């Protein structure tokens, strides 16, 4: 077994999170539940002594490759808590002493209109009430860190507006604030640590969003119900200047760790190119030295699963002199 996550906590590097494919999770979970006949023993190649059990990256005993951290979206999960133990068993039944799961809230599925919801009755519609409740409870039950239920800033753009009816960035922010208030008022403190999702396509929209939601992380306002970390979305992932300016504002506002808060997780969504991995590591080290020693930065990508779905594989580079 190769342990690729053994130094995640102590190395000082920003932590890479594989965004785990729902299709992959479902097939491994069906194997555990005995609900599929897609993988008879004769289909398992020689050398795979643990069969499909070995394909579970969270299984430290049987996994051919073990990795301690991952990201999985509520937008792909079975939100029925008991049903999820079967359909998403690979991730939700993991050994939580040795693994960390960051949960995405499903904002992409909502903002893109993939989930059919009644946008004309956003606050009081039965479908919206159920979605908010089910996502909150799933994240609390199965994730160590969880993103808040945002309505992404891009959801008002023309290609999505016909499905969502959103008029402008302010409309996205207003609805996000409503969802945040629901999470604050209905969460069970201690079950998961929530990451306040920060959007922005430029400094102007980033500031608008930040000013609208920053108080949700303020313990002097919400006590132990306050959100504990941040998810950097929109152009914060990809625009280094925008990200750094946002972190400086968070520092100056005293929101990178308050009072007894000994764990501040900052996730940068959907970026994993090597230069950004190096940059985020440098940023984490500086924040730990000068602001709060308990800050952790992570970043994610679905590349391992997308690559495999296209019949491709990673290999080590040839570094000889020729």
Task: Kindly give the residue locations of the regions a language model identified.
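Non-catalytic, usually N-terminal nucleic-acid engagement modules in DNA/RNA processing proteins
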Residues: 1-183
